[in-house]
């Protein structure tokens, strides 16, 4: 009787038009219900029954029922799903086949298209898969998915890293191209330096060796030659291989695992500066005076070289840092020893010159996670920066400064690493903060490289960790640009990296630009969006690195929750909810909520974790601050999220 009744349809439409509507994003919880969050900051409750129609992250239109605090959102129209593609675990129980999303906030029953053929295609219970959402519950009958690919077998102990890489849409294996590896720039003249005794210093297991060094002392100081492997001699511009390298942007490094930017035929073989192998390189010879200052114009040129010595950081550091070595320790030949001692002298002078005239970072240790065959941490090495690291770092920094100036002068374009110092809107805060420590400054001076560098040198003399942390939080973000700009944090006018072209796409581009100057060509242009492309790729890689480390640390430390082990930790962040600390012995990060800063959690409201001041304040007294090194203990491990919850070894005292 009422079916297809136009009056009834019109009435229904009118009623719906009269109901208030809101557009926003769905935020799920682990308790079944959720919220609709609008762009204007309003939140509307979504009951569990309605949450079955939507997914976490969906952008929807919703009817708003009720008023005030009791108003609820009823999902009505999907604008865009936040889960078009996601990672899930396959569950096969006899004839019942389903998936459980890796993200615990993705609730709902997901049907699988073609599920009955999965087992015959080699899929097993527990396998990890990438799935595509074919239809949405708001647009039809439930959620229908389709498997795109298998990511990892259920039995793979290293599945977590493949899952992490897939979650961030990163490549999980080396690119493969059927390509004849021939020199594509025969017009570039290459000097024959195969008899010059270049050497490499890398990790013991490094395969993609891209820099070699040679040094001579002269009456004015030193002549340093930096030879960099030249993959641009093999990778054609605008080719499919070049496009893939641009998409990846960097080689991805995870514990015991890497995914190269270039095919391994290049990265680990033809372009790796292996001992005794003839390789195409781009070289830079730099003259440095006895004060450690770069003098004159650096010389860039193509060359064929052979690495005469493959060295590692540990052996070189042990040799340079010890006057006497036991018979079983590595010792260089007479020729190599002279080079190492000469480069050691240069690097010390160069570091001192930069300390006096530029800006120098405080050295931080490296943490190396050693894994067993189960994919778990077997050992964590805390490795301080040693003399061999200084040799390489000072050489590379000098070479990159030279490249920045060279490209700025000859091309007015390139891939420049830039940094504008303190954020412009925070300069007033910087001036006020510095005045508290007796340092006079002004906004205009701080906005220049010279002024910023001078302030950095003054603050370094104070050796005040609290001030260093506060200033760091007032800095702008580093950026990558295609036109020359200063790098305040290094204290230089230009900085363009070209020393890692095997593993960084920006460095590969700079190789092409430097060579275009040598060949007097003007056919290479750097896109305006190159900085956005490289920054976005690096952000994803850092998220993947963080996620893998969180998983490994949580597995490694979960059995220490009940122990009374005390860790030395430095406070590096203070937010309203608590503090974040870095464990000095293993590099792990603990979060300590306010409730675990004191003995009685009910006293947490009396603790002011002041983010603006970087201090923990109780009754107007500073109890803790950024840069403090304190004793902490592990309180809880959230394995699912990889979060480590800590507590103070000695709780803060709360007065009555």
Swiss-Prot record:
<dbReference type="InterPro" id="IPR011129">
    <property type="entry name" value="CSD"/>
</dbReference>
<keyword id="KW-0540">Nuclease</keyword>
<dbReference type="InterPro" id="IPR011804">
    <property type="entry name" value="RNase_II"/>
</dbReference>
<dbReference type="GO" id="GO:0003723">
    <property type="term" value="F:RNA binding"/>
</dbReference>
<dbReference type="Pfam" id="PF00773">
    <property type="entry name" value="RNB"/>
</dbReference>
<feature type="domain" description="RNB">
    <location>
        <begin position="190"/>
        <end position="518"/>
    </location>
</feature>
<dbReference type="GO" id="GO:0006402">
    <property type="term" value="P:mRNA catabolic process"/>
</dbReference>
<feature type="domain" description="S1 motif">
    <location>
        <begin position="564"/>
        <end position="649"/>
    </location>
</feature>
<dbReference type="InterPro" id="IPR004476">
    <property type="entry name" value="RNase_II/RNase_R"/>
</dbReference>
<protein>
    <recommendedName>
        <fullName>Exoribonuclease 2</fullName>
        <ecNumber>3.1.13.1</ecNumber>
    </recommendedName>
</protein>
<dbReference type="GO" id="GO:0005829">
    <property type="term" value="C:cytosol"/>
</dbReference>
<dbReference type="GO" id="GO:0008859">
    <property type="term" value="F:exoribonuclease II activity"/>
</dbReference>
<dbReference type="InterPro" id="IPR013223">
    <property type="entry name" value="RNase_B_OB_dom"/>
</dbReference>
<keyword id="KW-0378">Hydrolase</keyword>
<keyword id="KW-0269">Exonuclease</keyword>
<dbReference type="InterPro" id="IPR012340">
    <property type="entry name" value="NA-bd_OB-fold"/>
</dbReference>
<keyword id="KW-0963">Cytoplasm</keyword>
<dbReference type="InterPro" id="IPR022966">
    <property type="entry name" value="RNase_II/R_CS"/>
</dbReference>
<comment type="function">
    <text>Involved in mRNA degradation. Hydrolyzes single-stranded polyribonucleotides processively in the 3' to 5' direction.</text>
</comment>
<keyword id="KW-0694">RNA-binding</keyword>
<comment type="similarity">
    <text>Belongs to the RNR ribonuclease family. RNase II subfamily.</text>
</comment>
<dbReference type="InterPro" id="IPR050180">
    <property type="entry name" value="RNR_Ribonuclease"/>
</dbReference>
<dbReference type="InterPro" id="IPR001900">
    <property type="entry name" value="RNase_II/R"/>
</dbReference>
<dbReference type="Pfam" id="PF08206">
    <property type="entry name" value="OB_RNB"/>
</dbReference>
């Amino acid at each position: 009787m009422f079916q297809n009744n136009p009056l009834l349809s019109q009435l229904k439409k009118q009623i719906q038009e009269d109901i208030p509507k809101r557009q926003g994003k769905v935020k799920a919880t682990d308790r079944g219900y959720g919220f609709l969050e609008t762009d204007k900051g309003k939140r509307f409750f979504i009951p569990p029954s309605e949450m079955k129609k939507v997914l976490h992250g969906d952008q929807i239109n919703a009817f708003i029922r009720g008023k005030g605090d009791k108003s609820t959102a009823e999902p009505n129209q999907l604008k865009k799903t936040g889960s078009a593609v996601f990672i899930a675990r396959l569950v096969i129980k006899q004839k019942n086949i389903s998936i459980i999303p890796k993200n615990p906030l993705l609730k709902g029953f997901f049907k699988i298209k073609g599920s009955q053929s999965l087992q015959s295609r080699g899929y097993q219970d527990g396998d990890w898969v990438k799935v595509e959402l074919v239809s949405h519950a708001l647009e039809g009958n439930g959620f229908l998915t389709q498997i795109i690919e298998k990511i990892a077998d259920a039995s793979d102990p290293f599945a977590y890293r493949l899952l992490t890489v897939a979650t961030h849409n990163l490549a999980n294996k080396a690119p493969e191209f059927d390509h004849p590896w021939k020199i594509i720039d025969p017009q570039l003249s290459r000097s024959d330096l195969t008899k010059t005794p270049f050497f490499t210093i890398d990790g013991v297991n490094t395969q993609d060796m891209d820099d070699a060094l040679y040094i001579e002392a002269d009456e004015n100081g030193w002549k340093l030659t930096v030879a960099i492997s030249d993959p641009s001699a093999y990778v054609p511009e605008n080719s499919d291989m070049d496009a893939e390298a641009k998409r990846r942007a960097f080689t991805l490094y995870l514990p015991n695992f890497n995914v190269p930017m270039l095919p391994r035929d290049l990265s680990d073989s033809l372009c790796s500066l292996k001992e005794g192998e003839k390789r195409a390189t781009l070289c830079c010879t730099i003259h440095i005076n006895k004060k450690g200052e770069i003098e004159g114009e650096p010389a860039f040129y193509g060359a064929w070289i052979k690495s005469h010595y493959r060295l590692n950081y540990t052996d070189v550091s042990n040799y340079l840092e010890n006057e006497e070595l036991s018979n079983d320790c590595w010792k260089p030949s007479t020729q190599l020893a002279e080079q190492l001692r000469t480069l050691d002298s240069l690097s010390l002078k160069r570091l001192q010159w930069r300390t006096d005239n530029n800006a120098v970072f405080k050295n931080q240790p490296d943490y190396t996670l050693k894994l067993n065959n189960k994919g778990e941490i077997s050992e964590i090495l805390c490795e301080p920066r040693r003399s061999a690291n200084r040799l390489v770092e000072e050489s590379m920094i000098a070479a990159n400064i030279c490249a920045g100036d060279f490209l700025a002068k000859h091309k007015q374009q390139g891939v420049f690493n830039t940094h504008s110092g303190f954020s412009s809107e925070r300069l007033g805060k910087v001036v006020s903060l510095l005045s508290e420590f007796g340092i006079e400054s002004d906004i205009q001076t701080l906005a220049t490289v010279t002024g910023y560098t001078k302030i950095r040198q003054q603050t370094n003399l104070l050796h005040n960790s609290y001030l260093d942390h506060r200033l760091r939080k007032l800095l702008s973000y580093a950026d990558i640009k295609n036109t020359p700009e200063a790098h305040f944090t290094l204290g230089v006018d230009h900085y363009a990296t070209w020393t890692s072209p095997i593993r960084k796409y920006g460095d590969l581009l700079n190789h092409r630009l430097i060579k275009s100057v040598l060949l007097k060509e003007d056919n290479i242009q750097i896109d305006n969006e190159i900085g956005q492309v490289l920054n976005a790729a690096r952000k994803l890689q850092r998220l993947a690195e963080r996620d893998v480390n969180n998983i490994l640390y949580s597995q490694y430390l979960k059995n220490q929750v009940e122990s009374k082990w005390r860790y030395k930790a430095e406070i590096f962040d203070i937010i309203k909810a608590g503090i974040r600390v870095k464990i000095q012995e293993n590099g792990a990060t603990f979060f300590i909520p306010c409730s675990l800063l004191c003995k009685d959690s009910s006293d947490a409201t009396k603790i002011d974790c002041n983010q603006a001041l970087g201090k923990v304040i109780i009754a107007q007294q500073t109890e803790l601050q950024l840069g403090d090194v304190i004793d902490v203990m592990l309180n809880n491990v959230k394995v699912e999220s990889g979060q480590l919850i800590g507590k103070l070894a000695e709780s803060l005292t709360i007065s009555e």
